[in-house]
Amino acid sequence: MNVSWALLAVVLVLTVATYECRPRGRILGGQDSKAEVRPYMASIQQNGIHQCGGVLIADKWVLSAAHCATNSSNSSLNVMLGAISLSKPEKYKIVVKVLREIPHPLYNSTIKHHDLLLLELSEKVTLSPAVNPLPFQNENIDISAGKRCLVAGWGQMRLTGKKPDTLQELWVPLISRDVCNRRNYYDNEITANMICAGESRKDSCEGDSGGPLVCDGIAVAIVQGGFRKCGNPTKPGIYTLIEPYKSWIMESMYNATLQSNPSPL
């Protein structure tokens, strides 16, 4: 009898361990993307290593998250576009140096407010079936809770730190701000400029930060960073809405263009 109970205890321990080791990455529960399906996706890299996601919004501009910035006057970042695989050769894959990093001036790394970053590329990219900008939300439209939107990235897939070589994508439901601000969720930390999305064991994670949340073919928000256990139903993914920052985006792009191409006296 004692042996039987010992065996049962071992089985229970192994079962719990197996459950805890299931993937919990941000793009947890996702699937491989396909070539040319997400031509707006960008991999922001430092020394050839993927750091964050991003979204191509113009032929010389990528939108990402402010916590992905290097905080250096001379950017050491590169952006990979036209890729599904981070390592394998692909027909339209290109790597472009970042000329300028423009984090939102009010970004607060402690509370993650205004977590947006504009990256000006060193050259205009040649558009192709695998490299194409995505329009972003510029109208103040409240998207209904429960709507399923797409998030993609090369972020962490397991708590062990495993990251994919192939772009992962996942449809996640939006969660109302009222629910996300409940005490057992984020306890009133979600501002009017943020939105939550995700469900149990379906989420985005470390390395997906900066990538877009896409609803009806439009980038509506950007994946935030944060210290949380990915895939936790009461700690869903937090995203920075793009629409409240449309003026900052357009003005920053315009001013940077003027600096790069000053008018003759």
Swiss-Prot record:
It is an enzyme of class 3 (hydrolase). Residues 27-254 form the Peptidase S1 domain. GO terms for molecular function: serine-type endopeptidase activity. Keywords: Disulfide bond, Glycoprotein, Hydrolase, Protease, Secreted, Serine protease, Signal, Zymogen. Its main location: secreted. Glycans are attached at residues 2, 71, 74, 108, 255. Residues 1-21 form the signal peptide. Residues 22-26 form a propeptide. It holds the Pfam family Trypsin. Its EC number is 3.4.21.-. The active site is at residues 67, 115, 209. InterPro entries: Peptidase_S1_PA (IPR009003), Peptidase_S1_PA_chymotrypsin (IPR043504), Peptidase_S1A (IPR001314), Trypsin_dom (IPR001254), TRYPSIN_HIS (IPR018114), TRYPSIN_SER (IPR033116). It is found in: Secreted. GO terms for biological process: proteolysis. It comes from the Eukaryota. CDD domains: Tryp_SPc. Belongs to the peptidase S1 family. Probable serine protease. This is Serine protease ami. It comes from Xenopus tropicalis.
